[in-house]
Structure formats: C-alpha cells, structure tokens
C-alpha cells in the first residue's frame, strides 16, 4: 500500500512540474522580442492593411488578456494542439513527430552503448583495484569527463572525413554522434560502478560467501551485481534526460535532422510555435524519464522502500539484500 502511495506522490510531482514547464514556456514566448503577427503576415516585406492585422490578432487571440491567452494555451496543450509553424504552416505536433524519432533513437542507442561499455569496465576497475587496468580506465574516464562533447565530435569528424576519407551517412549521422555522447556518459557510470563495487567487496556477506567456498564469479553475479547496478538507475534517468537537451549541439554539429537541429533552425527564423514545441518536448521528456527512473528504483530497491517507509531509519541499511543468506 505504501508503494502505491509513493508512486502516486511521484506522479503528482510530475504533473506539477509539467504544469510549471508549460506555464514558463508560455511566459518565455510572451517575453521574447518580435510580434507573431509581423512574422505571419511578413510585414517586413509586404504592405498589409490594419484590418488584416487586427483580424490576425483576433484569430490568434492576442487581443485577449494574458490570463485568457494562458488559459487557451493550456487548453490547446491538453489537446496536443501547439499551433502551426510560421514558416511551413504545418501543425507543430506533426513537425515534432517527424523530427523526434531520430533524436530518441540516438539517445536510447547512446544509453545502451554506455551501459554495455561502462558496467564491465567499472567491474574490471574495481576487481583490479590500483592495478594497471584500473589506472588506465580511471585516466580515460577523467579525460572523457573533461573534454566537451562537441570537441570530441569535431575530432571524430576530422579523423573519419579527412584522415580516413570515409563518406557515409549512417556513420556521420548515427554512429559518430552515439560514440560522442556515450564517452561522457560512460565515464560517470564507470566511476559509480567502481565505487559501489569496491564498497560492496568489503561487506560481511561477501566475506561470508568466500568463507563458504563460493568462487568470485558466483559472488559477483549473485551477491554483487544487483546492488551495484541499482544506484545506476537514477543516474540513467538524469543522463537520458540531459542527452535529449545535449543533442542540440551534437545534431547541429553532425547535421542530424532531430529535435535539437529543429530548435536551432526555429530560433534562427524566430518560428515561435516550433520553439515552444521543442522546449516542451525536451522538458516533458526529461521529467517523464526521471519519474520512471524514480519509480523503478522504488520498485527494485528494498533499501529505498525501507527508508521511505520509515523516515527515521538510518542510512546504514545493508547494501545487499539479506536474501543472499540463501547460500548458507
């Protein structure tokens, strides 16, 4: 029952945050320079009568008070109506549906590649503590965190296009961006896995399993893997959300037709409805992904449930579930 209450509480938090994001997006567009009517009627290059200007304002609801405009904005948002682009006259929702798949594909591919690389490397670094392999992995992780993603992308582009003379759309618009985004994400996961595993290797349950004659692989899989990976879930939620925002630079660097590319192009042309749609998409995605990560952590981690169920409980709750005593 408590888990259901906690899940409902997090869902309510998500709704409140989404409401705030929607309101801030509305305010941001109202404070932005320029007039939508000027953009729609092309007043900078065309002669338009005052009747046409007033008719356009009435159609857009610009003559209403800000409160009424906000109410209409929220009502349209609930019906997935984000208006039409000033440039192409297409519905913004349809434009987002056209550009979002490539951004989501790159983001989730980055997540999968990062997990496949970082978890094994983090385990190796912990198992070979202070040995050569551990030092090499830590140095590479530090470099990956220190270098900006766009700088790594420029280096990869130079190597592939100039030195190797490879001209491939899949390579330049999918493989290289995924590698570029994965390097920084891998570094954080490697360090988290390494630190968690080093702490768990000193636990009493692991020592007891060794005394019972269990081999290291068995201990790793049955006693250490789950408590090592569980703390990664919240980090993945934050990282995946930031990946969507981070693709703004990477998509423009690699000329990828995704949400980030669309956002920059809309800013240049001052296409406000599309800008609103892109900001809302990124904000909503970040909030939803982080909420899912929190719910997964709550469902899978007994320690989290115990601490939430008993706020006075101390942080010294065993990191490894006592179910490991089944080996006894």
UniProtKB/Swiss-Prot annotation:
Protein family per UniProt: Belongs to the binding-protein-dependent transport system permease family. OppBC subfamily.
Protein name as annotated: Nickel import system permease protein NikB
SUBUNIT field: The complex is composed of two ATP-binding proteins (NikD and NikE), two transmembrane proteins (NikB and NikC) and a solute-binding protein (NikA).
Location (main, coarse): membrane
Membrane topology: Multi-pass membrane protein
NCBIfam families: Opp2B
PANTHER family noted in UniProt: DIPEPTIDE TRANSPORT SYSTEM PERMEASE PROTEIN DPPB-RELATED
Cellular component GO terms, alphabetical: plasma membrane
InterPro entries: BPD_transp_1_N, MetI-like, MetI-like_sf, Opp2B
Location(s) in or outside the cell: Cell membrane
Functional note: Part of the ABC transporter complex NikABCDE (Opp2) involved in nickel import. Probably responsible for the translocation of the substrate across the membrane.
Transmembrane segments: 11-31, 104-124, 139-159, 170-190, 229-249, 279-299
UniProt keyword annotation of RNA-binding present: no
GO molecular function, one term: nickel cation transmembrane transporter activity
């Amino acid at each position: 029952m408590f888990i259901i209450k906690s899940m409902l509480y997090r869902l309510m938090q998500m709704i409140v945050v989404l409401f705030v994001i929607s309101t801030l997006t509305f305010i941001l567009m109202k404070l932005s320079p320029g007039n939508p009517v000027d953009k729609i009627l092309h007043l900078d290059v065309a002669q338009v009568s005052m009747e046409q200007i007033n008719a356009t304002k009435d159609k857009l609801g610009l003559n209403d008070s800000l409160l009424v405009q906000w109410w209409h904005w929220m009502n349209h948002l609930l019906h997935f109506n984000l208006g039409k682009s000033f440039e192409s006259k297409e519905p913004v929702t349809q434009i987002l549906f056209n550009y979002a798949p490539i951004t989501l594909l790159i983001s989730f591919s980055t997540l999968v590649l990062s997990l496949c690389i970082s978890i094994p490397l983090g385990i190796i670094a912990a198992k070979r503590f202070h040995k050569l392999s551990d030092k090499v992995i830590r140095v590479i992780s530090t470099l990956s965190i220190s270098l900006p993603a766009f700088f790594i992308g420029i280096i990869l582009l130079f190597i592939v296009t100039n030195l190797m003379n490879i001209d491939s759309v899949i390579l330049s618009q999918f493989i290289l961006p995924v590698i570029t985004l994965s390097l920084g994400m891998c570094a954080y996961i490697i360090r988290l896995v390494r630190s968690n595993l080093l702490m768990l290797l000193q636990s009493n349950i692991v020592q007891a399993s060794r005394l019972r004659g269990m081999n290291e692989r068995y201990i790793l899989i049955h006693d250490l893997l789950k408590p090592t990976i569980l703390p990664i879930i919240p980090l993945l939620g934050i990282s995946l959300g930031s990946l969507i925002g981070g693709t703004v630079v990477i998509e423009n660097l690699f000329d990828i037709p995704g949400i980030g590319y669309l956002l920059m192009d809309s800013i240049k042309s001052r296409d406000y409805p599309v800008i609103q749609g892109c900001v809302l998409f990124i904000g909503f995605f970040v909030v939803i992904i982080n909420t899912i990560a929190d719910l997964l952590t709550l469902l899978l981690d007994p320690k989290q449930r115990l601490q939430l169920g008993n706020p006075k409980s101390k942080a010294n709750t065993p990191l490894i579930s006592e179910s490991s005593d089944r080996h006894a």
